[in-house]
């Protein structure tokens, strides 16, 4: 018997394993479920090895879209998705996704092939200083020096991506490592890293925050995507209802408390921000999205209570009255404890609530009037009114564009947390289809039956439109709505277009924001086997969307034509719309 064991041990000591398989096993050990990428030399074997272990590999048409998809998986699941890219240009294409993940604080792992070690500084194929280049866009960027170190580096990258403020990490894999063989007994896989530690705010600071809130006459809660990521929906909703507090979600904070909740004051956004005397920030940064917390968008003496997981974020742009460093859900529960001990409410019949309700009613009436217009082509409000009428309550909404995203945000409701993905903190165009693919995969595995509605401006669709083939290849029942105004911000109708081109060439005549009028984007979908609809009227929109929602077997694209000069309703403040056009 001892001789048999010795023989088995001897056999195992001679067993070899490739670098590709070590990478795949190390990722599997860290509970990585999804990998997106564009394969080629030298990373194809890594994708194949990952599939052998049950990691889902989704081949995309561009590294940028692959990186966007992987980062969205990180946000939706709390575990990083992996983006696999080839060396040099392949990695460069992924930098946009890495930067976007870091700016949005989403966990992401990028694995990039690189030139062989023995060819360094010789002008090797696609040679580039990749580790150094990625440091600007990541929390951690490293290259294992041996195959044996790969599991250590992968565990550290996964842990770094989810601990503290989440973000992107990069792992550089030399081409010769992929096929290089190592003794199987020399590889020591690291245990799956533990979930991120949950930190709580100082008790004295929590008491101070509760005291400031009790003294408020015009309180406001702002719910950011940090609250969504920390799964704080139950605690924040309880706080909202128990204290009768008005709340305003940021774009990806929508759904933490449902948009149709009576305490949601999204329709009175500007008035709420400008008039509040105490504002509690739940995982929301005072960046451009919230106008930096400064006048004239806010009162000069407004008091901020800032809750964030990242200490460096506290106090940016304004000095908070109270800072609460910790996990958003944990700190929300700490605040609830204070109001459980000594109940308090913002009076529902207060002048503050009356002011907000009046402004909401006024703004909603304007939007309703715009939505009810019968003229053709349709305007944005008419389109989104009819979409909202049929939108399933549990839908994932992915949105990008200019007016398409801004108006859609106000009219398309989210009722569940982590069910809205958009251009985010970085204002990134081109994310839409990658995000939609990620959401569809996560929905399929974790919440079967939930639909993904991807709402794109026609310009935004152009950034990653070829990912329609990816959607069809994996048969993801995504519904794409391309809101088509023939341009970036605004375009021209076909008659005006023809007149412009009659006397001069397009390069000197066509305004920079114009796109080809009446482009049939729905044919991109039908070319790959999905369903496409060319929509001009409310009746056609209702019919085609109803059919798309009923058919769960194929992806669909609705190309919705609107008035080329359609725009937003008049705004109290011109937010990102300063232009002389």
Swiss-Prot record:
Pathway(s) the chain acts in: Lipid metabolism; fatty acid metabolism
InterPro entries according to UniProt: DHS-like_NAD/FAD-binding_dom (IPR029035), HACL1-like (IPR045025), THDP-binding (IPR029061), Thiamin_PyroP_enz_cen_dom (IPR012000), Thiamin_PyroP_enz_TPP-bd_dom (IPR012001), TPP_enzyme_TPP-bd (IPR011766)
Residues that, per the record, bind thiamine diphosphate: 63
Residue numbers carrying N6-succinyllysine: 354, 361, 368
GO CC term (a single one): peroxisome
Cofactor stoichiometry and binding remark: Binds 1 Mg(2+) ion per subunit. Binds 1 thiamine pyrophosphate per subunit.
The UniProt record lists the keyword Nuclease: no
Reported cofactor(s): Mg(2+); thiamine diphosphate
Tissue: Predominanly expressed in liver.
Localisation per UniProt entry: Peroxisome
NCBIfam families: PRK09259.1 (NF006721)
Free-text function comment from the UniProt entry: Peroxisomal 2-OH acyl-CoA lyase involved in the cleavage (C1 removal) reaction in the fatty acid alpha-oxydation in a thiamine pyrophosphate (TPP)-dependent manner. Involved in the degradation of 3-methyl-branched fatty acids like phytanic acid and the shortening of 2-hydroxy long-chain fatty acids. Plays a significant role in the biosynthesis of heptadecanal in the liver.
Main subcellular localisation: other
Sequence segments annotated as region (Thiamine pyrophosphate binding): 404-487
Recorded phenotype for the gene knockout or disruption: Mice are viable and fertile and show no abnormal phenotype. However, upon dietary administration of phytol, phytanic acid accumulated in tissues, mainly in liver and serum of deficient mice. As a consequence of phytanic acid (or a metabolite) toxicity, deficent mice display a significant weight loss, absence of abdominal white adipose tissue, enlarged and mottled liver and reduced hepatic glycogen and triglyceride. The presence of an other lyase, probably HCL2, can partially compensate for the loss of HCL1.
EC number assigned by the record: 4.1.2.63
Protein name per its UniProtKB record: 2-hydroxyacyl-CoA lyase 1
Subunit structure comment from the entry: Homotetramer.
């Amino acid at each position: 018997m001892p001789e048999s064991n010795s023989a088995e041990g001897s056999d195992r000591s001679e067993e070899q394993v490739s670098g590709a398989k070590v990478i795949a096993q190390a990722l599997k050990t860290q509970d990585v479920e999804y990998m997106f990428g564009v394969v080629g030399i030298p990373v194809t074997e890594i994708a194949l090895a990952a599939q052998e272990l049950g990691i889902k590999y989704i081949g995309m048409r561009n590294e940028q879209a692959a990186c966007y998809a992987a980062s969205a998986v990180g946000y939706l699941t709390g575990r990083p998705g992996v983006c696999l890219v080839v060396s040099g240009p392949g990695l460069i294409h992924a930098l946009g996704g890495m930067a976007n993940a870091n700016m949005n604080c989403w966990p992401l792992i990028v694995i990039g092939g690189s030139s062989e070690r023995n060819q360094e500084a010789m002008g090797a194929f696609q040679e580039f200083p990749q580790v150094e280049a990625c440091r600007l866009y990541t929390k951690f960027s490293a290259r294992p020096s041996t195959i044996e170190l790969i599991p250590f580096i992968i565990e550290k990258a996964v842990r770094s991506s989810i601990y503290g403020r989440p973000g992107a990490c990069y792992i550089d894999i030399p081409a010769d490592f992929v096929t290089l063989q190592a003794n199987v007994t020399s590889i020591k896989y690291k245990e799956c890293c533990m979930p991120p530690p949950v930190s709580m705010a100082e008790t004295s600071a929590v008491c101070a925050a509760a005291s400031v809130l009790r003294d408020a006459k015009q309180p406001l809660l702002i719910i950011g995507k940090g609250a969504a990521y920390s799964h704080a929906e139950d605690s924040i909703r309880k706080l909202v209802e128990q204290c009768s507090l008005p709340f305003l979600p940021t774009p990806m904070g929508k759904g933490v408390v449902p948009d149709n909740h009576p305490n949601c004051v999204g329709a009175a956004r500007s008035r709420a921000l400008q008039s509040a005397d105490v504002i509690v920030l739940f995982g929301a940064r005072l960046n451009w999205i919230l106008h930096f917390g400064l006048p004239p968008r806010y009162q000069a003496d407004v008091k901020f209570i800032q809750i964030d997981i990242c200490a460096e974020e506290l106090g940016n742009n304004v000095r908070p009255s109270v800072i609460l460093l910790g996990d958003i859900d944990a700190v929300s529960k700490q605040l609830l404890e204070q109001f459980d001990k000594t109940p308090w409410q913002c009076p529902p019949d207060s002048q503050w609530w009356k002011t907000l309700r009046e402004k909401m009613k006024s703004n909603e009436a304007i939007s309703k009037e715009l939505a009810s217009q019968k003229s053709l082509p349709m305007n944005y409000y008419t389109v989104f009114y009819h979409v909202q009428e049929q939108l399933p309550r549990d839908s994932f909404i992915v949105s990008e564009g200019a007016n398409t995203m801004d108006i859609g945000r106000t009219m398309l409701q989210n009722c569940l947390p982590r069910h809205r993905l958009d251009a985010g903190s970085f204002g990134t165009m081109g994310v839409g289809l990658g995000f939609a693919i990620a959401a569809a995969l996560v929905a399929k595995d974790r919440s079967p039956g939930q639909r993904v509605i991807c709402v794109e401006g026609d310009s935004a669709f152009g950034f990653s439109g070829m990912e329609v083939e990816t959607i069809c290849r994996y048969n993801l029942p995504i519904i794409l709505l391309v809101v088509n105004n023939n341009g970036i911000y605004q375009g021209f109708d076909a008659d005006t277009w023809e007149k412009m081109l009659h006397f001069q060439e397009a390069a000197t005549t066509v305004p920079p924001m114009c796109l080809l009028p009446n482009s049939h984007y729905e044919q991109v979908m039908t070319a790959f086997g999905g369903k496409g609809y060319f929509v001009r009227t409310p009746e056609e929109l209702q019919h085609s969307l109803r059919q798309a929602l009923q058919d769960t077997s194929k992806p669909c694209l609705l190309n919705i034509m609107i008035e080329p000069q359609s725009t937003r309703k008049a705004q109290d403040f011109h937010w990102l719309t300063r232009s002389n056009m």
